[in-house]
Amino acid sequence: FVPEWNAENCIQCNKCAYVCPHASIRPFVLDAEEQKGAKFEQLKAVGKVFDGMTFRIQVDVLDCLGCGNCADICPGNPKKGGKALTMKHLESQLAEADNWTYCAENVKSKQHLVDIKANVKNSQFATPLFEFSGACSGCGETPYVKLISQLYGDREMVANATGCSSIYSGSVPSTPYTTNAKGHGPAWANSLFEDFCEFGLGMELANEKMRARICLLYTS
């Protein structure tokens, strides 16, 4: 089962994306140019900063693990009386794969238009730099990891403690950590069974040393 979006009941709160363990459901805001090629339902985006733009919750049905967290958290529209997300058989939602591809490849992030640290809704307009991990369906850790990557991922350094996070973050040959449009993203390393706090301190000291060396080269 995967979630199906009912635009009529959506209040654009973005809570569904906030709780998703795998970043497989996201809000997209489309400008006039991006709307031209979109062949799916959209809503008028709420907020003055999104004037003339449209809003859509898009599910990546091929990466969704069907935990149902998004449908559970969805408050729906009190005036309409129903949730905006309901779980449906995957076979009935396969057409959404093309819609996801369009959004992912053609719709640019609008996070620069809002303060992504102001509230839950705004935070989810930021592109996740942690996505499609090998974590279990409904994982309670990865939504936090994903959120940190949205807020600080372009300059994030992770000293990972051994546990579930070392498995879903570093399963060769892939990694759930990714980069933004500028090529910036988290730096991740795992110390296995060592003291990860000390390991992280070493990363910080090394970073400071490299920055100091760059400054020295520029001034000498």
What are these regions (language model features)?
Residues 1-12, 29-66, 86-94, 123-133:
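Ferredoxin-like iron-sulfur electron-transfer modules
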Residues 15-35, 60, 69-92, 115, ...:
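Iron-sulfur cluster-binding cysteine motifs and their immediate structural context
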